[in-house]
A protein has these predicted regions:
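Extracytoplasmic
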Residues: 103-108, 170, 290-292, 352-522
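Active-site lumenal/periplasmic loops and adjacent helix-entry segments of GT-C-fold
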Residues: 16, 20-156, 189, 193, ...
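Start-transfer (signal-anchor) and selected internal transmembrane alpha helices
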Residues: 1-29, 347-353
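Membrane-interface transmembrane helices that cradle and orient dolichyl/undecaprenyl
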Residues: 155-176, 283-289
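Transmembrane catalytic cores of multi-pass membrane glycosyltransferases
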Residues: 40, 179-286
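Signature aromatic-anchored transmembrane alpha helix within multi-pass, membrane-resident enzymes
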Residues: 220-224, 327-364
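Hydrophobic/aromatic-rich transmembrane helices and adjacent perimembrane loops
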Residues: 100, 306-338, 351
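Membrane-interface helix-loop-helix junctions at transmembrane boundaries of multi-pass membrane enzymes
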Residues: 5-12, 206-217, 268-301, 307, ...
């Protein structure tokens, strides 16, 4: 692969700084409107506190939601956060801004990877595409991005330096690659699987022979040795069970053919307007087939197999490369042909797509994006009351305004047990590490509770008497949060709230403009 001429180094560096600054601004403007971490992260918040309470020793279990969840999660970013919190840096502020900073660093990391697998003239374009893809940062800048951002950064750097090692067989690059993969392992398990399997496809591209297999094996083995103090301790404490349970919880059927067609929908690339990047991905796949770039085509479909639950967050790296192929092989030649002779009108035609993508990215981060919901000030006030005035181990049902969102997008559902130190019966987070299909049970419970929003209280009570949920203890409190911005249009929980207020078995024990809490007497 041709290297950059020395004369072009500084212009390239300047362009990279501009693109990275754009990435930082996009992330910052998404985070700033909320005074609380975006969306999820409550379980990791508790785990950081568990580490601090244990004197920075690795706890055996996390106290999150009083569920006896094994502390088997890769702990690197949690320890980094716990250490930074010893400085005058509030923990909630770290959960707001640390993922933002680490996620921004993935842009120059991707640049290093693109330099190894693309022509020099295409590298900055690929980096810009990666920057403008919402999937490259939306889940990384949330509160839960405290782990995802570290995993994404180290996995991309692993691929970049491994590609250098495959090309040059340098001991230095071998050691760096092994160290970076080790950091990925102790940051995020799913991204570890993505990095390891991606190494195989990079080997097919650079060294498709037995020598390449030996290089990949050496990197993986060395990284396992480097991380052995952690995973051997986890195996000694809990065995393989937590990892097998977590892996099983993520498995679900997915049809790659349907997925390819699904790219034309904006829900895959999370574009606000037309799915331009999704369409370019389809065109890029055609180009990769035409060029016989089977390694890239296979890499593109890899996340569907290894991480079916979260593959859209991992596919962004090969997707950016595929889109780059579409632009350089189809769009640029087309525009070059139609804009001759050069004029202001032709320049405008050439810039219309990148300008559109920039506008789309800016629109994505505007307030109101469902991905960037967070716990409100009224909800925080209610949670503080719960922590102060309800008995320890009290059991709650959380009825949040996100009736049409999945459990993973319900910020109150995860942050309530973290901040109140009380039990939320329908919170699935963390239960993927538990046996007996606990994760599936909690997800089902969450869905069942949503089905009771427009019914009377007996709907909630009947859930716990059904055979499926009979093993769970019944709730003692119900916390209902309303979206006041929608009260003039719809209020899914208003009917249930009125029913609870009129029932002799329920007593309103707390109320503020958004939240009402009821105690329940069976």
């Amino acid at each position: 692969m041709p290297s950059h001429p020395k004369s072009s180094f500084f212009p390239t560096l300047d362009s990279l700084v501009i693109i990275t600054s754009l990435a930082f601004c996009l992330r910052l403007f998404a985070v700033l409107p909320s005074s609380f971490p975006l969306n999820d992260g409550g379980m990791f918040y508790t785990m950081v506190q568990d580490i601090q309470a244990a004197g920075f020793k690795l706890p055996m279990f996390t106290s999150f939601n009083s569920s006896l969840i094994p502390f088997a999660y890769p702990p690197l970013s949690l320890y980094v956060t716990a250490l930074l919190n010893t400085l005058p840096l509030p923990l909630l502020s770290l959960f707001r801004f640390l993922p933002l900073v680490v996620s921004t660093l993935t842009v120059p990391a991707f640049f290093l990877l693109a330099k190894q697998v693309l022509k020099s003239k295409d590298v900055l374009l690929a980096t810009l595409i990666f920057t403008l893809l919402p999937r490259s940062f939306e889940w990384q800048i949330m509160g839960g991005g405290i782990t995802r951002s570290f995993g994404q950064l180290f996995s991309i750097l692993t691929l970049a330096y491994s590609a250098k090692f495959f090309r040059q067989s340098s001991k230095t690059y071998f050691l760096i690659s092994s160290l970076l993969l080790a950091l990925t392992i102790i940051s995020h398990l799913e991204l570890t699987f993505f990095a390891v399997s991606s190494l195989i496809f990079l080997t097919l591209h650079f060294t498709p022979n037995f020598s390449g297999i030996k290089k990949v094996s050496a990197i993986i083995l060395t990284s396992l040795i480097l991380t052995s103090p952690w995973w051997m301790l986890i195996l000694a404490r809990h065995g393989l069970s937590p990892f097998l349970n977590a892996a099983a919880s993520g498995l679900q059927a997915f049809d790659p053919t349907s997925y390819t067609l699904f790219l034309t929908l904006s829900s895959v690339t999370d574009e606000v307007f037309l799915p331009v990047l999704g369409t370019l991905t389809l065109l890029g796949l055609v180009v990769t087939i035409q060029k016989r770039a089977w390694w890239l085509l296979s890499w593109f479909y890899l996340p569907i197999i290894i991480a079916p639950r979260n593959f859209l967050n991992f596919i962004v790296v090969p997707m950016s490369l595929v889109i780059t192929h579409a632009v350089t092989s189809l769009l640029l030649p087309f525009f070059t042909h139609i804009i001759k002779p050069f004029s202001f009108r032709s320049l405008l035609a050439l810039l219309i797509i990148p300008l559109y993508l920039l506008v789309s990215a800016i629109a994505f981060i505007l307030p109101g994006n469902r991905y960037f919901d967070s716990v409100s000030s009224s909800e925080k006030t209610a949670i503080e009351w719960v922590k102060q005035y309800t008995p320890p181990n009290s059991r709650f049902l959380i009825l949040s305004p996100q009736i049409f969102s999945s459990w993973g997008m319900d910020s109150l559902l995860e942050w309530f047990p973290a901040l109140s130190q009380r039990i939320s019966l329908a919170t699935p987070q963390g239960t993927e590490w538990l046996p007996n299909h606990e994760f599936r049970l909690r997800k089902k419970l969450h869905q069942k509770i949503k089905g009771c929003y427009l019914q009377d209280p007996s709907c909630l009570e009947s859930i716990f008497s059904s055979p499926t949920f009979r093993s769970l203890p019944i709730f003692q409190y119900i916390l209902i949060s309303r979206d006041n911005s929608l009260l003039s249009q719809a209020c899914e929980v208003c009917l249930l709230t009125q029913q609870l207020q009129n029932s002799p078995r329920y007593k309103s024990v707390y109320q503020n403009p958004q939240v009402t809490i009821f105690s329940f007497s069976p």
